[in-house]
């Protein structure tokens, strides 16, 4: 580890070697975790470089039309995420900044909209202005270590420390990254990609491409992004099927009451436990159910019980689903943009929590039915609906009703495939937690079939939820 620290000191001995643009400090006055409370009260991150990385070749200069599924998210801003990489002495030049910039410049040739800016067309409709100005690239250093974040849980402090502050430059920037060299020799890579430009699938595609160029060998084997978003244009005239409303646009009234204390905790469900849940979801008919449906059904039931919801209340689980394979014809491979609509499953609390349906068949069936409903007509109806209504996607203040649960699945996505040549990340997570009632499902990164369940909920029910989550195993 001494070698790592010497490398870090050598790398920053000369400010001129970094082509320094600006230096600033972010003082952290909050405690990041109880484990390190005595050490981390006044830690800081020092930004030593901030610049724009432009595509290394000429790219199209044009206004890129945004689909209704993109416009839904125009006010959501940037999605903050952090990757942690432990120090590795081989193959040398750990997280070499020049190498990362060169790889970014290559990736932005294919993903040229990410080098543009959010703008408006002549009619006042949001679009991506493909200017080629580049992505924001920040380099920083910190006396913190990866061990200070071993719980790998999202927090406002995590975002402040490691995710680039796009608002300090221009909110119209679509792509920003920050490479923070830590005292232990490791690196925290923070990303801020604007949701109007990419959903999770497209974001991981971009990061995979960037990291592949950094590893070397050229990009011949990489899948190119597909940029024609007019494939998701509304029909003329728009037509919304009556049965589609309950599937993709359920009304939600947020409470204006002060929010309770919200905590975020990670739970690991082993491969054997996932298998047991999937068996419980199909009963004796020998059918099959996805890991997403099985885990979502179990978590939904546990939350309803932990919250002690009235038996007659209607509870609802909503989740984002990709439209890419549901359309006819399917969207081309590598479609870059937002290809997500939200679906919902609902039921009476007594049915979701009934002890007589311990096999979870009913609950999983409700979720599976919602998934099966998504066909070309449902997707087209959703696109037409969002074109007609022009919904403001800015997150509303307030808290969700206790009867609501939202599950976002990153299962099967290449979350840990962002390898720049120095190994895969030790952990990846969103840098901020959601309001109570949000759950993220993702592979645990151990390559053992286990799943990480990241739960944001009211502090008062956390212990009950944990007990219920594991009680059936």
Question: Can you name each region flagged by the protein language model?
Answer:
Residues 72, 174-180, 436-444:
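Short, surface-exposed beta-strand/loop micro-motifs that present aromatic residues
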Residues 400-473:
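Low-complexity, glycine/alanine/valine/leucine- and proline-rich hydrophobic stretches
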Residues 1-27:
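Intrinsically disordered, low-complexity basic segments at termini and long loops, enriched
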Residues 29, 41, 47-62, 75-78, ...:
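Soluble acyl-CoA-dependent acyltransferase catalytic core bearing the H(X)4D motif
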